[in-house]
Swiss-Prot record:
Pfam families: BacA. Belongs to the UppP family. It is a multi-pass membrane protein. This is Undecaprenyl-diphosphatase. It comes from Lacticaseibacillus casei (strain BL23) (Lactobacillus casei). It catalyses: di-trans,octa-cis-undecaprenyl diphosphate + H2O = di-trans,octa-cis-undecaprenyl phosphate + phosphate + H(+).
Length: 272
């Protein structure tokens, strides 16, 4: 029963932070140091990523018509959707090439509070610096159709940075997209779309690794997984809608300050 309650809390954290540029993995790592599940470390490591499935479904639900080429009434519209998917896949490739070989090493060495705190602060500072730099500049990529294949690849290269816990997958891609000249709204949406193949790939790897190690799932573990995923799905829907409204009238500096504050608090707790 206590693990179900913990799964609800972790699911809320996942749903709130997955698409905000503040690092869901970093937050979940920190939460796990406070309310760790009463399960094996193998299960906990896998659980942290599997509950992202709920967040993926939230994007699929909210953008189903936009991302479904077969729902389009004309050949031109269908072709545009297929092109969008091609750009998303191109953007995902760098993370796949770099992340796959380093997956096990990162699990063993980088999921620590000091790594999370450091990356939270560093990228928080970068967001503030970038937003100040862009203050009087206009974006030249203002629609998803304006994103070229080359631009998609560049954004994907920035996503590689997110393999370090605390960086934030959405934060890295949004930061890169803004630097390239993408509007905040388009950068945010494209980040959502990149999450689908990226997180599905990570999900497959983590479950595969868990099973390869000879592990299985008990009834309680299935309940914990389902609870965390459902909660993250429901909360992510709210978070996505809120973020899309927020970026239409605000910049990302509040997230930068939040990252710096949280990272500083973690470091203070560690060393005091």
């Amino acid at each position: 029963m206590f693990d179900i309650i913990k799964a609800v809390i972790i699911g809320i954290v996942e749903g709130l932070t997955e698409f905000l540029p503040i690092s869901s993995t970093g937050h979940i790592d920190l939460v796990n140091h406070v309310i760790k599940l009463s399960q094996s470390q193998d299960f906990i490591s896998m659980f942290e990523y599997v509950i992202q499935f709920g967040a993926i479904l939230a994007v699929v639900l909210l953008y189903f018509n936009k991302l479904n080429p077969f729902s389009k009434p004309t050949a031109k519209a269908r072709n545009a959707t297929w092109q969008l998917w091609a750009k998303v896949i191109i953007a995902v490739l760098p993370s796949a090439v770099v992340g796959l070989p380093l997956n096990s090493w990162m699990d063993e060495h980088l999921h620590t509070p000091i790594v999370v705190a450091t990356t939270l602060i560093v990228y928080g500072i970068l967001f503030i610096i970038l937003e100040n730099y862009l203050k009087n500049k206009s974006a030249h990529i203002t629609t998803l159709a304006d994103i070229t294949y080359q631009t998609a690849l560049l954004i994907g290269l920035f996503q590689v940075l997110s393999i370090v816990p605390g960086t934030s997958r959405s934060g890295a891609t949004i930061l890169g997209a803004l630097l390239i000249g993408t509007s905040r709204y388009v950068a945010t949406e494209f980040s959502f779309f990149l999450a689908i193949p990226t997180m599905v790939g990570v999900l497959i790897i983590k479950i595969g690794k868990y099973l390869w190690q000879g592990n299985g799932f008990s009834g309680e573990q299935w309940a914990v997984l389902m609870t965390g995923s459902i909660v993250s799905f429901l909360v992510a829907i709210v978070a996505i809608k809120w973020l899309l409204k927020f970026v239409q009238t605000h910049d990302f500096k509040p997230f930068g300050w939040y990252r710096i504050a949280l990272g500083a608090i973690v470091l203070l707790v560690m060393f005091i």
